[in-house]
Amino acid sequence: MNAPDLTRPPLTIRRISLDTGRENVAVISRRSRALRPEVFRGFSRVELRINSKVLLATLMITDDDAMIGPDEVGLSEPAFRRFNEPVGSAVSVTPARSPASLDAVRAKIQGHTLSAAEITAIVDDLAHFRYSDMEIAAFLISAARFTTTDELLALVGAMASVGTKLTWDTPIVVDKHCIGGIPGNRTTMIVVPIVAAHGLMIPKTSSRAITSPAGTADTMELLARVDLDVEQMKQVVHACGGCLVWGGHVNLSPADDILISVERPLSLDTPEQMVASIMSKKLAAGSTRLLIDFPVGPSAKVTSANEAMRLRKLFEFVGDHFGISVEVVTTDGRQPIGRGIGPVLEARDVMAVLGNKPGAPADLREKSLRLAAHLLEYDPKLRGGTGYARAKELLDSGAALKKMQQIIDAQGPSPCPAELGSYAADVLAAADGVVNGIDCLRINRLARSAGAPVAKGAGIDLFKKIGDRVEKGEPLYRVYASDRSEFDLALAAAQAESGFAINHHTPADVDLVS
């Protein structure tokens, strides 16, 4: 019996205004002359080819000829951008072979340990968009069951080697990272100018928010451009000693961004996956000294000292293997840090601290100073134990603010208006007493439901923190939104459950940084 003829008449490219995340999607008509029902099915993988240029995509089939004609193939926005061919170009569409590395994923599902070569092949296919989201999920779930230390090291190395790898002309390149989960907590934007003002190099790449109301990049974008390419980033670092840019535009460890896009909806966040994600980016960034902030609290990502210790050892193990000196500090994760939650409000807090303004959040200032102190003591010229005094000197003197302004000027003007949302209302205490707890997850969700971080001026402005005495009817915080429907949704949710625990017990003091 002869094999079926898989040759097809070419189709012409049509751009579809469809955001499919990071997945390439191709859409063809059920009446397409190129469609063979016995070969093509919805959600199968197809190969689009123009000469030597190839794009793999997940296929979807439509009965709506107004959307896609019989002689067309529609490309989602990510697919159209990556293929980079003009609308109307003739393209062949054929069934795609599964990546050979999927055999290793199947082996992992069955409980086998993977070799470094197998992991490298998987990461290469991930980075080149050869996996569908379902295939990525299969890999993540198989790795979540168990990952050996050898597999972890291979994964970090492979992820760091795909994409941009930065090198610097100084032996000490410092960096900091917080594992997240705490609202506000915008310490990076204070630590970077302090450290750079001292003279240590700190080329900071940061993420945009995924599940939080703001990432460092979302907040910094209100002050300066963050979408710098590699050469622009290097120019800023050489001129200023540091930068605050969006890592997604620099293309560090692109496979990690692809994995994260599937991890988040599945709520997958194992210690090994967290370590691989963070360390692959730091390795690619050329960091030699790394400070990691572990907030510990009942609604933080790390909820106990034992959990923090295990994660710390894993980070240090990977750092030792790749020549990165890793220091882990545990911090108070019981409540938000700073007053503002959401890009505009967080930028306000940062500039208040850098400007030494009356009323600047004391907890944000103190935590930033302590974290900066750890990084400054990587300088061999600085006497041990004097990092905090030096950090305080740089902040109090205005040197850190001056350095921040230099970084802002070098990165270029912000494209975003720094305006608070036009809708605002206070959420009130339901009883007299003392604030005994704040649910960080709840506060994050409320700020996001108000529109943050997409709406830069949306979020929550806190008036009370743990240990504060409140009276019934007194404002706990203010909700801001730029859209009426989002405002109504967030306010109703906050009034139903504020996220504040109020009783008559005095909470225990916890050190900000230990």
Curated annotation (Swiss-Prot):
One of its GO terms (biological process) is pyrimidine nucleobase metabolic process. Keywords: Glycosyltransferase, Transferase. It catalyses: thymidine + phosphate = 2-deoxy-alpha-D-ribose 1-phosphate + thymine. It comes from the Bacteria. PROSITE patterns: THYMID_PHOSPHORYLASE (PS00647). InterPro entries: Glycosyl_Trfase_fam3 (IPR000312), Glycosyl_Trfase_fam3_N_dom (IPR017459), Glycosyl_Trfase_fam3_N_dom_sf (IPR036320), Nuc_phospho_transferase (IPR035902), PYNP-like_C_sf (IPR036566), PYNP_C (IPR013102), Pyrmidine_PPase_CS (IPR017872), Thym_Pase_Put (IPR028579). Pfam families: Glycos_trans_3N, Glycos_transf_3, PYNP_C. One of its GO terms (cellular component) is cytosol. GO terms for molecular function: 1,4-alpha-oligoglucan phosphorylase activity; thymidine phosphorylase activity. The keyword Glycosyltransferase applies. The keyword Glycosyltransferase applies. Its EC number is 2.4.2.4. Belongs to the thymidine/pyrimidine-nucleoside phosphorylase family. Type 2 subfamily. This is Putative thymidine phosphorylase. It comes from Rhodopseudomonas palustris (strain TIE-1).
